[in-house]
């Protein structure tokens, strides 16, 4: 990936990074899903600049070591079962970004993540292509995807994001795609508004982010109420930590979407703008 200079660099520079809740993949065929209008009006209401490339961190790609896909055309991975047949026909043939992938690998290795590697076969899982299909339906922006390491902690993923922050200067949009809460499937649904345990976690997260208390988010296991219910497994939370790191040293957080599914699954999504 070529570095830019002068006016080109200034024009391409991106100050924002985003954490989005990608939601249930059923939203691809369910027009009334609350995330549909959020994603479909992304360029109109949230981020109008066209990035040079997108680096997306999805909670649906779990690996032992940080891995980034390096392909020329992204395959569409239908990594879900027992959904309407039409959903398995969707394709999001966004071009890959192999030069960016190699740059990511290089940066990570130089930043202490010596085991970082590329994957030359993997496409985009639904944590990536489902929101991107609605946000950028033309599929004309190069995309590469970065994995999470669920056996490690929030601080590790924050530091990984810090290493990648300079990519924004080259016009790379960094998006973390996970979920503000991601309870187990067997967690009882709450039909009278929002489950109190989920509301308490969401309130803590919102206040911590808006007030810049990223250290608390990094060690959420000792700070957050009901975290074991909200994130019994961390893979859908760690994309947020990567994006927090990518925001840099000084940033401002803004809640850009909030809705709920079953009163337990929070669709909270945030923009982080660097100073």
UniProtKB/Swiss-Prot annotation:
Keyword Zinc among record annotations: yes
Record InterPro entries: Extradiol_dOase_DODA, Xdiol_dOase_suB
Cofactor note: Binds 1 zinc ion per subunit.
UniProt keyword terms in alphabetical order: Dioxygenase, Metal-binding, Oxidoreductase, Zinc
Ligand binding (Zn(2+)): 22, 60, 182, 236
Induction: Regulated by MYB1.
Gene Ontology terms, MF aspect: ferrous iron binding; stizolobate synthase activity; zinc ion binding
Cofactor(s) required, per the database record: Zn(2+)
Catalytic function, reaction form: L-dopa + O2 = 4-(L-alanin-3-yl)-2-hydroxy-cis,cis-muconate 6-semialdehyde + H(+)
Record's function text: Opens the cyclic ring of dihydroxy-phenylalanine (DOPA) between carbons 4 and 5, thus producing an unstable seco-DOPA that rearranges nonenzymatically to betalamic acid.
Stated family: Belongs to the DODA-type extradiol aromatic ring-opening dioxygenase family.
Protein name in the entry: 4,5-DOPA dioxygenase extradiol 1
């Amino acid at each position: 990936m070529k570095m830019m200079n002068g006016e080109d660099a200034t024009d391409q520079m991106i100050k924002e990074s985003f954490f989005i809740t990608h939601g249930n993949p059923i939203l691809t065929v369910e027009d009334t899903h609350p995330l549909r209008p959020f994603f479909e009006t992304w360029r109109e209401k949230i981020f109008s600049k066209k990035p040079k490339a997108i680096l997306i961190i999805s909670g649906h790609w779990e690996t032992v070591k940080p891995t980034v896909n390096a392909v020329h055309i992204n395959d569409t991975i239908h990594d879900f079962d027992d959904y309407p047949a039409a959903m398995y026909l969707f394709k999001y043939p966004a071009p890959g970004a192999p030069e960016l992938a190699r740059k990511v690998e290089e940066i990570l290795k130089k930043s202490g993540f010596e085991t970082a590697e590329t994957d030359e076969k993997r496409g985009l899982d639904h944590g990536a292509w489902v929101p991107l299909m609605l946000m950028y339906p033309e599929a004309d922006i190069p995309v590469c995807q970065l994995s999470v390491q669920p056996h490690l902690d929030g601080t590790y993923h924050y530091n990984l994001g810090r290493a990648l922050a300079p990519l924004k200067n080259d016009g790379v949009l960094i998006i973390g795609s996970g979920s503000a809460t991601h309870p187990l499937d067997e967690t009882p649904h709450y039909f009278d508004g929002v489950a109190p345990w989920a509301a308490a976690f969401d309130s803590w997260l919102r206040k911590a982010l808006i007030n810049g208390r990223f250290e608390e988010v990094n060690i959420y296991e000792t700070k957050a109420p009901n975290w074991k219910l909200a994130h019994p497994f961390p893979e859908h939370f760690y994309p947020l930590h990567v994006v927090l790191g990518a925001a840099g040293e000084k940033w401002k957080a803004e809640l850009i979407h909030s809705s709920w599914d079953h009163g337990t699954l929070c669709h909270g999504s945030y923009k982080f703008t660097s100073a």
